[in-house]
Structures are given as structure tokens and as C-alpha cells.
Swiss-Prot record:
EC numbers: 2.7.1.148
Gene name in the database record: ispE
Protein's UniProt keywords contain Acyltransferase: no
Record-given protein name: 4-diphosphocytidyl-2-C-methyl-D-erythritol kinase
Catalytic activity: 4-CDP-2-C-methyl-D-erythritol + ATP = 4-CDP-2-C-methyl-D-erythritol 2-phosphate + ADP + H(+)
Species in which this protein is naturally found: Pelobacter propionicus (strain DSM 2379 / NBRC 103807 / OttBd1)
């Protein structure tokens, strides 16, 4: 039977504004989302039998129906209605529950891979409509462009071209629940949203919009997030911020050498996860 292996990239948020709480319990957001080439690896193989299995072997990531990638594959197999199944194995290189979108990226990659293997011929827009039912960030990874995301994250517009950047990602390993962060976020009436630059020709242009409303919740509870931001800036990052609901912090650098040097100094003896990646 047919098979393929795909890469599922992580993301960082250059901007995360929380606009309002919605009646359905979600929040309206304004985000600028950027993919980076720290990737999970996903192998998908179709089978003649109808069983579906997803294997990851990573602590904190369920196998089977509890995995968002399983749900994505199930949705596509149900659409195909051909009696086939699939085996999916995931090598997790993206930290789990880290603000980097790893689970959403895995689901999006499975949707795109199954679309290809099953020869369903769905457009990206059709895949995105399936993806948003799985998770608010899933459509972004199908969109495959640096995006301004609004609504709960499903309304996507391509951003102007941005310079390629090197990104240092550091995760201190503290557990931050996304639900807890949003529950404890104090929404104040805000004025008009800051206008985004029309052009992004330099690293400084990107750094000028770095902002994350969720830091107001996470940093008081986990001061190490602020410590990492300060350390990154001290070691040459042109900007540093928490990604998503954390706890991963990213720093932006002009070149790989600067990012690698900062990584070596920052995490020596800490036991923290750290990786240098490039924007996609």
C-alpha cells in the first residue's frame, strides 16, 4: 500500500493580542504566526484493513484516538469511505504543550498527507475547514504562509514578505496549561489595536511588533520565562518573547552563529530544551 513521510514544522507567535472573550468560551485573537524548521517527522502508510493506529512513544502524547493526528486521519478515512485504514508513526522533535503548535502541525500534516495518499483532491480551503474542527491552529499549518490570524485563529491572511531569521527556542520544562492561562487572563478595555508595519525589510521591523498578552499571566507564575527573555537579549537576541501560551521563549537573531552561541551559553547545565531553527 502507499506510504509517505512528511515534516510537521513548529510555529512561533510574533504577536498575540487577546481582543475579547466570546460567548462560546473561546477568545477572539489577533496573531502573527510564523513557521520555523524545527519539525516532527510523520510516516503514514495506508492499509487494506480498516484499523487506524497512531504511535508516538513520547511521554505526554497519547497513542490512538486521544491523539489529534488520529482524529485527523479518521476524518480523512471517513471521507474516503473506501474501507482502508492507516498506520501513522510520529517522531516528536517539537516539545509537547510548549506554545509551538506541535500537535496542531501534526494534525495538519496528516490531513495533507492523507489527502494525497487517498487521492481525495481536496483543496487547502477544504482541508482548513476540516482542520478547524480539530483545533484552532490547524488551518495555519495548511495555509503554509506567515499569517495574520484573527477570530479564534482560523481567519488567515498572508503577511507581507519578511526577512529570513534565525530563532533560538528555549523551553524551561515547566507545565503551563493553555486553559489555565486564558482563565486567569484579565481582559481590560483596550484602545485601538496597534497598527502593524506594512513592510518588513529588517529584523528590527519584525521585532517592533513582538507582543504577547498572555505573558501577563505566565510570567508572574513562572518568572523563569522573563529570566530567559532577559538572558537572550543580553546574549545578542534582537528581540525575545514567549510563544503562544508558553512556556517556550524564542529569540530572534540575524545569523545562525549568534543563535548557536547564545544557545550554548544560555542552557549550559540547565537541562532545558533548546534548539536553533530558521524561519520558513
Amino acid at each position: 500500500m502507499k506510504s509517505l513521510t512528511l515534516k510537521a514544522p513548529a510555529k512561533v507567535n510574533y504577536l498575540l493580542d487577546v481582543i475579547r472573550r466570546r460567548p462560546d468560551g473561546y477568545h477572539d485573537l489577533r496573531m502573527v504566526m510564523q513557521r520555523v524548521n524545527l519539525c516532527d517527522e510523520i510516516a503514514i502508510a495506508l492499509t487494506d484493513s480498516p484499523e487506524l493506529s497512531v504511535c508516538c512513544g513520547k511521554d505526554g502524547v497519547p497513542d490512538g484516538p486521544g491523539n489529534i493526528a488520529w482524529k485527523a486521519a479518521r476524518a480523512m478515512l471517513d471521507l474516503a469511505a473506501g474501507g482502508q485504514g492507516a498506520t501513522i508513526s510520529i517522531v516528536k522533535n517539537i516539545p509537547v504543550a510548549a506554545g509551538l503548535g506541535g500537535g496542531s502541525s501534526d494534525a495538519a500534516t496528516v490531513l495533507m498527507g492523507m489527502n494525497q495518499l487517498l487521492e481525495l483532491g481536496l483543496t487547502d480551503q477544504e482541508l482548513m475547514r476540516i482542520g478547524v474542527k480539530l483545533g484552532a491552529d490547524v488551518p495555519f499549518f495548511i495555509f503554509k504562509k506567515t499569517a495574520l490570524a484573527e477570530g479564534i485563529g482560523e481567519q488567515l491572511r498572508a503577511m507581507p514578505p519578511m526577512p529570513a531569521l534565525w530563532v533560538l527556542l528555549v523551553n524551561p520544562g515547566v507545565h503551563v496549561s493553555t486553559a489555565w492561562v486564558y482563565k486567569n487572563l484579565r481582559l481590560t478595555s483596550r484602545g485601538e489595536l496597534a497598527k502593524l508595519p506594512q513592510f518588513f525589510s529588517t529584523v528590527e521591523d519584525v521585532c517592533s511588533m513582538l507582543s504577547n498578552d498572555l505573558e501577563s499571566v505566565t510570567i508572574p507564575a513562572f518568572p523563569v520565562i522573563a529570566d530567559i527573555k532577559r538572558a537572550m537579549l543580553a546574549k545578542g537576541a534582537l528581540g525575545a518573547m514567549m510563544s503562544g501560551s508558553g512556556p517556550t521563549v524564542f529569540g530572534l537573531f540575524r545569523d545562525r552563529e549568534g543563535a548557536e552561541a547564545a544557545r550554548a551559553e544560555l542552557v549550559e547545565g540547565s537541562g532545558w530544551f533548546a534548539a536553533v531553527a530558521e524561519t520558513l
